[in-house]
Swiss-Prot record:
Subunit structure: Oligomeric complex that consists of at least the alpha, beta, beta', gamma, delta, epsilon and zeta subunits.
GO BP annotation list: endoplasmic reticulum to Golgi vesicle-mediated transport; intra-Golgi vesicle-mediated transport; intracellular protein transport; notochord development; somite development
Name of this chain's protein: Coatomer subunit beta
Name of the coding gene: copb1
Entries under InterPro entries matching the protein: ARM-like, ARM-type_fold, Clathrin/coatomer_adapt-like_N, Coatomer_bsu_C, COPB1, COPB1_appendage_platform_dom
């Protein structure tokens, strides 16, 4: 009934395993064969007609010998046959034989079997000959009163189609259907009848709706959906009707059908901007997300909530629903949780942040009690980051959050613990009043930390922010506890010597004799020569890291000990205590150096770590004021500067987002008076039903269409030359998951070209959906052929092929014109995206495909080259603008993008300007691209190479 329902296809499976039969054999089967033979013959006739055969001699045979049969399969096949068979003479007059067929239609419309009646009515919807339909009108009208709903609903469809195409055949159709609708009880029949009134006589549809508006909630969901559509269209065209129908939309929010609730909520938002309407719609969306089990539905509805939030006035209403939105976190799907947390974070305000933090704390504790799973770890990370953001925006909440989160520093999941550590580092720097609490909790969990990266970070925080003698002593105590007895080498050797003795006293069990390859006997000891693992488990954490050969943590330990020792010297007045503390710190460093150079660790200490520890020993032995300032002031100043820059960037990005959302009102814009406000509001909105229909049909307007200077002609690809007998050019229309080729084919000859076929093939991750149908081109005629290509991933695809045709009257072989290749631009599938530095590094380490592109350009400015690459690749620069600003001879930047298929693409730009070659020297260097798939890495590299060459020329 809508634009999408105007076309109805019947799909027929064609087998190519046999030769096409002759007309004589088909005629014999149709005349004298059994039911089965007639069925097969009729199928073959249908396929041959679809392939372009005329078969005029079989029409009367089928009317005489097949049409009278009552077999249901044959009746179904006959409906297909009558649909495709030519019904007119070359001059457009109806064939005489069709009068007999018309009588058969009439009998089928009066058949006692409801299926035959209903399917015949459906078939009549496809007829385009009014002469055939006119004698059938009384029988079609009578079907409206049939006892079976299948017949009645198809009768409504038939009447609507006939009224739309040939109004003179049934001029009273709207009145007839209105009367039918008033008395009808079946939901599907009422839906079809109401749908017809919407399109044929909207006033009658509104009159009917007005009479039963209070009973709408009792209707079936299919009728409710149509009512929602009608109300939307009426109010969109005539805003003054909103007050009349908005209560009905409110009632439909309580429908038992999720589809009706979803459509009603969307309609309510477009019809009214009142806070009560927005709140009701948002509440409906939230209930749908919670109750629906399909994660795709949850994500779609979440997107609608996010769209609501983009409107400044709606955002204030949604802020009161943050706690309801958090109920969605009961969904186990990570993507749903991620979107929910982001939405809640965007909406949180000082009024509800406390409640939000309480809920998130409970969720964090829950993740600790759940069986470990990959998604559980990622969810915990999301929660930690959300709490981190809340604490930065609302400092009063930090004191409640920190104790809970710091328990996770001892977590085995390094990623979650690293997020907690980053949060703690920022909190201890920003909030002076929380430092004692953070130090206390850090000292509590310090011994339980299991991963070396987290241990290093915790050491740094303790060394940087312990400012009292008691805290400094506590740090030293924890370090000694974590290191075990010192000197480490002597202690380990003693343990080794002590463990050998009891093993010698153990009575060896009788060992079985084994035969070697050489035929000699060998005995197997019952004692294991490898070190028992329990001893390794019993080692204190820091000693365990050192014995594993990780001496980077030793360098971090040396820096921490230097900081606390210098601070202790400044705080303690007793010279003996000062010397004692410094000596203890130096002893620990010396014993670590000794261990690193011994053969006990799995890996020896590196030269860099030796230099760092030696430097710290020298600083402590000399205690100069300059070194004191560097260790105790400059380090903290660097952190403070980094956090300030990051905060400034976040504020800048938030400002840009808010500017995007705010509707700018120009000084010369017309003023909307009260009487005109509603109309003005509605006029600015597009028809949502039309937009969704276009999206479903793949006709959405892409972003380039928003530019008035942009033209489809920019994407036209010439496929053949002007001197070829057939000229062809294609417009490449890229949708989300498919490509539509709109090919213009022009016959440049004076001959008629028969069976002109566009033959296409693909290279890459592309797949041709269906082969274009052959056509006939008159001399100098033209036609448009459309072909659909399915896209499965972001790779550079190539479409190639040719046009083949026969010349009318010529006896030669088929002619062929080879087409130029069509290269599919992957930029249509790549979108800029953001990720944190930690996520970027993690993906960089995980992705196995790398493509290194050498810079080859004539651009002489580093920033200009970077901007050119960003524009060419559609990627986003993750490196802050401040880090890239200034005049420098080199530049390094990280770029990131995601495809619509969820594929990640990373790039690292490392470029320099060779000073010795002069001011006009071009930029050189390289770009490293990493991706999970080889195709993505290669495609992006090709794109960069092509754009460089274009610039260079």
């Amino acid at each position: 009934m809508t634009a999408a329902e105007n076309v109805c296809y019947t799909l027929i499976n064609v087998t190519n395993d046999s030769e096409p039969p002759s007309e004589v054999s088909l005629k014999t089967d149709l005349e004298k064969g059994e039911i089965k033979a007639k069925t097969e013959a009729l199928k073959k006739v249908i396929i041959m007609i679809l392939n372009g055969e005329k078969l005029p001699g079989l029409l009367m045979t089928i009317i005489r010998f097949v049409l009278p049969l009552q077999d249901h399969t044959i009746k179904k096949l006959l409906l297909v046959f009558w649909e495709i068979v030519p019904k007119t003479t070359p001059d457009g007059k109806l064939l005489q034989e069709m009068i007999l067929v018309c009588d058969a239609y009439r009998k089928d419309l009066q058949h006692p079997n409801e299926f035959i009646r209903g399917s015949t009515l459906r078939f009549l919807c496809k007829l385009k000959e009014s002469e055939l339909l006119e004698p059938l009108m009384p029988a079609i009208r009578a079907c409206l009163e049939h006892r079976h709903s299948y017949v009645r609903r198809n009768a409504v469809l038939a009447i609507y189609t006939i009224y739309r195409n040939f109004e003179h055949l049934i001029p009273d159709a709207p009145e007839l259907i209105h009367d039918f609708l008033v008395n009808e009880k079946d939901a599907s029949c009422k839906r079809n009848a109401f749908m017809m009134l919407i399109h044929a006589d909207q006033d009658r549809a509104l009159d009917y709706l007005s009479t039963c508006i209070d009973q709408v909630h009792t209707f079936g969901d299919i009728l409710q959906l149509v009512i929602v559509e009608l109300i939307y269209k009426v109010c969109h065209a005539n805003p003054s009707e909103r007050a009349r129908f908005i209560r009905c939309i409110y009632n439909l929010l309580q429908s038992s059908s999720p589809a009706v609730k979803y459509e009603a909520a969307g309609t309510l938002v477009t019809l009214s901007s009142a806070p009560t309407a927005i709140k009701a719609a948002a509440q409906c969306y939230i209930d749908l997300i919670i109750k629906e089990s399909d994660n795709n539905v949850k994500l779609i509805v979440l997107d609608r909530l996010i769209e609501l939030k983009e409107h400044p006035t709606h955002e204030r209403v949604l802020q009161d629903l943050v706690m309801d939105i958090l109920r969605v976190l009961t969904t186990p799907d990570l993507e749903v949780r991620k979107k929910t947390l982001q939405l809640a974070l965007d909406l949180v305000s000082s009024r509800n942040v406390e409640e939000l933090v309480i809920v998130l704390k409970k969720e964090v504790i829950k993740t600790n009690n759940v069986t470990e799973h990959e998604d559980t770890d990622k969810y915990r990370q999301l929660l930690v980051r959300t709490l981190h953001s809340c604490s930065v925006r609302f400092p009063d909440m930090a004191a409640n959050v920190i104790p809970v989160l710091m328990e996770f520093l001892s977590d085995t999941n390094e990623a979650a613990a690293a997020d907690v550590l980053e949060f703690v580092r920022e909190a201890i720097q920003r909030f002076d009043n929380l430092r004692p609490l953070i130090i206390e909790k850090m000292l509590e969990v310090f011994h339980a930390i299991k991963t070396v990266k987290i241990y290093r970070g915790a050491l740094w925080i303790l060394g940087e922010y312990c400012s009292t003698k008691e805290d400094i002593q506590s740090v030293m105590t924890e370090v000694r506890r974590s290191l075990g007895e010192i000197p480490i080498v002597e202690n380990e050797l003693k343990k080794e010597a002590g463990e050998v003795k009891p093993e010698e006293e153990v009575t060896a069990a009788p060992a079985p004799k084994l035969v070697t390859e050489m035929g000699t006997y060998v005995t197997q000891s019952a004692l294991s020569t490898s070190r028992p693992s329990k001893k390794e488990e019993d080692r204190p954490p820091l000693r365990g890291f050192l014995m594993d050969g990780d001496f980077y943590v030793a360098a971090s330990l040396a820096t921490t000990l230097t900081k606390v020792a210098l601070r202790y010297v400044a705080l303690a007045e007793d010279k003996r205590r000062q010397n004692s503390f410094v000596a203890e710190a130096m002893l620990i460093m010396a014993t670590v150096l000794h261990l690193g150079k011994s053969s006990l660790p799995k890996k020896p200490i590196t030269d860099d770590d030796v230099d760092r520890i030696s430097l710290c020993l020298k600083v402590l032995s000399e205690c100069s004021p300059l070194m004191n300032d560097i260790f105790n002031k400059e380090c903290r100043r660097s952190l403070s500067h980094m956090l300030a820059v990051r905060l400034e960037e976040e504020k800048l990005s938030q400002k840009k987002e808010s500017e995007k959302r705010n509707v700018t009102v120009q000084a010369d814009d017309p003023i909307s008076f009260m009487q005109l406000t509603a109309k003005n509001e509605m006029a600015s909105k597009e028809d949502q039903f039309q937009l969704s229909l276009l999206a479903a049909m793949g006709n959405t307007q892409r972003k380039e269409a928003t530019d008035p200077l942009a033209s489809k002609l920019n994407k036209v690809t010439q496929l053949t030359g002007f001197s070829d007998p057939v000229y062809a050019e294609a417009y490449v229309h890229v949708n989300q998951y498919d490509i539509v080729l709109d090919v213009l084919v022009v016959n440049q000859t004076s001959d008629t070209l028969q069976n002109c076929t566009l033959e296409l093939a693909t290279l890459g991750d592309l797949k041709l959906v269906e082969k274009p149908s052959p056509l006939t081109l008159a001399p100098h005629d033209f036609a448009n052929i459309k072909a659909n290509v399915k896209v499965a991933s972001t790779e550079n695809g190539i479409i190639f092929g040719n046009i083949v045709y026969d010349v009318s009257g010529a006896a030669s072989d088929r002619n062929c014109v080879v087409l130029s290749d069509i290269h599919i631009d992957i930029m249509d599938y790549i979108q800029p995206a953001s990720c944190t530095d930690a996520e970027f590094r993690q993906m960089w380490a995980e992705f196995e495909w790398e493509n290194k592109v050498t810079v080859n350009t004539n651009i002489t400015d580093l920033n200009d080259y970077l901007l050119h690459i960003l524009k060419s690749t559609n990627m986003k620069c993750l490196t802050p603008e401040k880090a890239l600003s200034g005049i420098c001879g080199f530049m390094a930047a990280n770029l990131y993008a995601r495809s619509i298929f969820g594929e990640d693409a990373l790039a690292n730009v490392s470029i320099e300007k060779p000073i010795h070659l002069g001011v006009d020297a071009p930029v050189n260097g390289h770009i490293r691209i990493r991706a999970k798939s080889q195709g993505m890495a290669l495609s992006l590299g090709d794109k960069i190479n092509l754009s460089q060459k274009r610039t260079a020329s």
